[in-house]
């Protein structure tokens, strides 16, 4: 995934209603589209099968997704799943089934240290702003505003990355 805007011209992922200003447009509405899901090959600790965490065989499927090809995880700690800089995701996130699974503004799953994420904003999202399922990179500057239904930043599983400890130090 490559989404590289600039400070003056950020990349904006939004809903069709927001772009077209269609009749009935609910400006600043939430749940108008699913959000971004980035699947990488970095080590995870929750394997779908009886595999050893951190090995190539240790893979999983993002919660609620039924496509068996939508796998993340592996053994590439420096996995490069792209670059997302100066990017805003807005009006995303929604429940995808009745078991409580939902899509977030951005879901990073098995994304490694080779992935660059800087100056990202998730605005008016219906679920978590950003959720991590095994993330080994530096998540940079991430802003979560208008994400009042759930949380802004969530690490679902995996060993906390150094960036999480840095985030904790800033907040504490």
Predicted regions and their residues:
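Beta-strand/loop edge motif enriched in small/polar residues
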Residues: 1-172
